[in-house]
Amino acid sequence: MSMQTAPIKKTTLNHLQAKKNQEKIIAITAYDALFAQIFDPLVDVILVGDSLNMSFFNQNDTLSASVEMMLYHTKAVCAGAKTPFIITDMPFGSYKDEKTALKNAIRVYKETQASAIKLEGGKEKAKLVKTLTNEGVIVVGHIGLMPQFVRLDGGYKIKGKNEEQQKKLLEDALSLEEAGVGLLVLEGITTPIAQTITQKIKIPTIGIGSGKDCDGQILVWSDMLGFFDSFKPKFVREYLKGKELVQNAIKQYADDVKKGNFPNELESYH
């Protein structure tokens, strides 16, 4: 009799929403199958972020990321990670109107195994969110510091420092929740308003640079593992000196080759 392996339990939106006020959601970025496979058993959510334009392609911002780029990397991540809830960023310009957004979101669903798409913007995106969810697309919202607006904002600026900003952030969160977003990313928001939003809305919040009171946290993997060291935001905690460790290994390899120590007899065919 053949032995059948137990089916892999895929994390769903229902699983994540059930964690609110119960258990913190663990999220991280990934852009390829190798790291997605490594992260798979350890996280609830993997975001294929347009941040890859900076950390993977060494660009100054996320704006030149394309739909094709996001599809390519999402396919790779889905090939490596089988259990996490996988979110794909909708890149700049890919959801400028309902027709464009629907076309690109449906492409993500048809061409990859992504669980959801993420878009940036507040209450002005509520109608678009409703349109997408009516077509069966799970939408993750993103408010606060929005990297796709970096040129308009004149840089990466923390939000929620005054009463006007705090009021807008709360209005945005409530509007997006009503429109149907399943999760809400809070980026670069002062801790008190992030806490208020998390308490006021029923869907989980995932924070990045928004304090510890969010329902979950996300970091860019190359930041937290010490690979992307040209600039380190205040909110990043390095858990590994990855760049240094890899460079030391390559130096050792190069030294072994130069000295004739690699390959040795056990590493050679006869």
From Swiss-Prot:
UniProt xrefs under Pfam families: Pantoate_transf
Name this polypeptide is given: 3-methyl-2-oxobutanoate hydroxymethyltransferase
Subunit structure: Homodecamer; pentamer of dimers.
Positions annotated as active site in the UniProt record: E187
Family recorded in the similarity comment: Belongs to the PanB family.
Gene of this entry: panB
Catalytic activity, EC: 2.1.2.11
Species the sequence originates in: Helicobacter pylori (strain G27)
Pathway per the UniProt entry: Cofactor biosynthesis; (R)-pantothenate biosynthesis; (R)-pantoate from 3-methyl-2-oxobutanoate: step 1/2
Residues annotated for 3-methyl-2-oxobutanoate binding in this entry: D50, S51, D89, K118
